[in-house]
Structures are given as C-alpha cells and as structure tokens.
Amino acid sequence: MSAFQRLRQIALAIILTWGWKRALVAITAGALSVLALAPFNLFPVLFITFPVLVWLIDGAGAGRYRGIPAAALTGYWFGLGYFVPGLYWIGYAFFVDADVFAWLTPFAVLGLPAYLSIFTAIGFALARLLWTKNATRVLALAASLTIAEWLRGHALTGFPWNAFGYALSEPLPLAQTASLIGLWGMTFLTVAIFASPATLIDRTPDRRVAWRAPAAAVALLIAMSIFGAIRLSLHPTTMVAGAKLRLMQPNLQQDAKFNYAAKTEVMKKYLALSDRASGPQSTGVRDATILIWPESAFPFFLTREADAMAEIAELLPKGTVLITGSVRAPDLPRGTPITRAYNSIYVIDHDGSVLAVYDKLHLVPFGEFLPYQDLMEKLGFEQLTRVRGGFIAGTVRHALPMPGAPSALPLICYEAIFPGEVAGRNERPGWIVNLTNDGWFGISTGPYQHLEQARMRAIELGLPLVRSANTGISAVIDPVGRTVASLGLGVEGILDASLPAAIPPTIYARVGDVPAAVLVALAVLLAVRRRVAKRHP
C-alpha cells in the first residue's frame, strides 16, 4: 500500500467516525495543536491536526447527527481539546489564596475552555454552511475560524488568548507578515496553510489538482519567509540616543503584593534591587534614564504614602524617571472610605512628582472585577485581587510623555494580547511599555504565551516593546520582534538595555484589520460562488 493510499484510508476512517470516537479525535487534534504555541512553537504539527478538522467536517453529514449541528459539536470538542491544555495554568491563580479560592480551580480550568469552545463550535458550523467538496472548503474553514476567533476576541470583554494566528509567531521571519495583516490575517493564513493537505485525498480526474492547495501553501510559507528575511535585514536594531533602560524584576511572591503589613519589606527590596550594580562598570540606577517596575508593584496606594514617594525621589538621580505599576485610589477627599480602585501606571520624576498616569482600560473578568459585581458580592463571591467593589476601568488610552525619550504606549498585563490597542492615528508613540504580573500563573506555559503575544504587538505596529514582569519574563524587544535582552521566568534581577528605536508605521498600523477582512470576505464569496455553481450548473 502506497503512502497516498494509507493517507486516504486514515482520512476515510476519520470522515466516517461518529459518537465518542469522533469526539476523541477532535479533542486529540485540539490538544496536539497546542504544541504549535509558545513555549514549544512546533507549528509543523498543524500539518497533521488541521487536515483532521477538514475531514471531520467532511463527515459531519454522516452518522446520527447531521450537517451543521454535527459540525458545531465537533468544533466544540476540538475547542475543549485546544483550550484546556492551552490554559491549564489559570488554575495556579486560585492557589495564591488557596483557603478562599482553591475550590474554584476545576470550575476555572474547565469552565473558561467550555465557554471559549462555543466560538470554535460557531466557526465549524459556519464552515459547514459554506462547505464544498473541493479545495475551496479549506478557505471556507479558514474564513469561518477567523470570524469565530475575532468574535472570541471581542465578545463580552474579549479573550483572544492563543488565537490560531500565534502559531506563526515563530520563526521570526514568518511572523513579519503580521506587519501587513495583523493577528486576524495571520489566523486566516494559519488555518488555510496547515489545513491544505486535507485535499490530497480528494478524487479528481487529474491527480495534480489534489496537490494544488498543498503546493500553494508551501509556496506561501516560502514567500512569507522571504518577505520576513528581507524585512529583518532592512530594519537592523537601532537605539534611541541617550535613552537607557533599567527593568527591575523582583520575583515577589503573590501574597506579599497584597499584604499591607509587608509594605516596608517590599519597598526595601525594590529600592535595593533597582540600585544593584549589573556589572563591574555599573553604577546602579545612575546608569539609567528610565527605571521600570512591574504591574501593581505595591501592597498600598503609592501616591498616598508620602514616605514611599520620598524614598523614590531619593533613589532617582536627576534626569531619571520611574515607570511603575500601582493601584490608584479615585480622587476622593482624604478620610473617605475607598471601595474601588484603578490598576494604573505612574511616571514619576526624580523629585517625586507624578508626570503622567494611565488607568487600565481592559480589566480581567473575575480577576479585577466581577460581572454583576454588587449581586455577586452579596452572594459571597469576590475577584482574585480581593478588592472590594472591583477595579474601575480607565476611560482612554493615551501615550505617556517621557522626558529624554519618545512617548510610550502603556499596556497593563493582558491588554497586550489585544491587537489594535493603539493610542490614536495622530498620536503614534515611540515604544510600547507593558507592565505585568504573571506571578499568578507560576512556572507554567502561561507567561511564555503572554510574552509571545505581546511581542506580536511590536511586529504589528513597528514599535519596540519594553516589558517589565514581576516574576518574568521581562524583555526588551525591537520593532520587528527581535529580543534585545531578557530576564527569565522565576528569576530575581535587573535588566539594563538601551531603548530600541521605532520604524515607520507598518501597513497594519495604518489600516488595521482591513487586509484581514478582505481575505475573509474573498474566501466567503468564493465558497458561496462554488456552492451556487454546484446547485445551478
């Protein structure tokens, strides 16, 4: 039996399977697909798993449940297989305060994937609606899953974590296509490219026809690699003159970050670590013009603690500013009970004055606020941060002015996973500053995934990314995605680096998701045309 005959035999077995066996195949395909993401980045595995999706939808008309419902159910099983191992690390957050939250772990580890799988079910159902018996069905699947992923990134508050397009974030030349079409365009190409081998089993008068889609996919990968290599060569890393960064990674335990009694020890550690010499020629914090501390750095309201502000002023040499995360109290008269707060970024001058403030816009559901907050609190529920009343969302994203350096686009924590989070068309910043606290997720795949997704924002926009993380991974990344310097996960230390310079705005920075929308629209139109032609030859 030839290799082609074996492939056809496997495909037919998948097409004809139903019941629990079909669910098992879909779940397995989803679980294996996670290997394409950070930290594994084994994207060739999708050449195996995505053709299986095509064959499963091919067989959605067989068995007890037929057509669109069968495709939707298959998509749901695939989603569970993909999201449970891809997001298992969420469970770590519930053990930070285990006495209160540990019992919720199985509900979170299974509940969030169960919700997100609704979107893969929608994608499969839409694909089946557009399905054909030729290679066009691959484009139908690519368009449908891209629409579903876009919905996942926007519905309610949105959660586009581990979107399929991130499978092409490594190697770096392939990721450069994101500068043209963004994450959703990369999602379309990911599905179209890796699902294409499914057509090898198609019965055609000319066997060469069955090879057209896989050949086109390989050609596209080669073209993307060439484009990426050229783009990387055209944009070597250059630095902003006079802008010297120092990132402080304290590797602080989560319980200390929310324990007011530990404020003295926390502040002492930050000050000592920030002024630590990084080498024989280092003079500590005097080496830097911009010192950066991570998200929600303190177990107190920073600007309401005069001693802490004075210590920061004493630490900073003249000409050096501090960018730090901190909870921020609303502007209320002193003595007024504080029931809610902002998750904020401060820019603080060497004399202890606040130069700029940004309040986080995209809050984490159940982490920073509860849906139906008042009702949920009455029922005894609270968010992981245990801030009564929940955090307040900011109102506008604006660039932070930076003395001696270009202005910075602020992103706090998972705001970096949302493509298109740009300050404004007329306010292009010089770099992205991302403060985060991935200590919630321990030593797991979560922080690696988070970094990879933040790096995609740099490539999309042509802006360098500077990322300060409590427990790692802190990094300085240039505007085409090269890592200039980094500190690993679970490491305490400081990172000294120059600030990479931005490059001219990318096509994606100029037009946003228009190219991705065009790709999806063309694929849908082609699929509809093929279906109409089949019914009315």
UniProtKB/Swiss-Prot annotation:
Its EC number is 2.3.1.269. This is Apolipoprotein N-acyltransferase. GO terms for molecular function: N-acyltransferase activity. It is found in: Cell inner membrane. Keywords: Acyltransferase, Cell inner membrane, Cell membrane, Membrane, Transferase, Transmembrane, Transmembrane helix. GO terms for biological process: lipoprotein biosynthetic process. The chain crosses the membrane at residues 10-30, 37-57, 76-96, 107-127, 181-201, 210-230, 507-527. Its main location: membrane. Residues 248-501 form the CN hydrolase domain. Pathway: Protein modification; lipoprotein biosynthesis (N-acyl transfer). Belongs to the CN hydrolase family. Apolipoprotein N-acyltransferase subfamily. It comes from Bradyrhizobium diazoefficiens (strain JCM 10833 / BCRC 13528 / IAM 13628 / NBRC 14792 / USDA 110). NCBIfam families: lnt. The keyword Endoplasmic reticulum does not apply. The active site is at E295 (proton acceptor), K360, C413 (nucleophile). Catalyzes the phospholipid dependent N-acylation of the N-terminal cysteine of apolipoprotein, the last step in lipoprotein maturation. GO terms for cellular component: plasma membrane. The keyword Transferase applies. It is a multi-pass membrane protein.
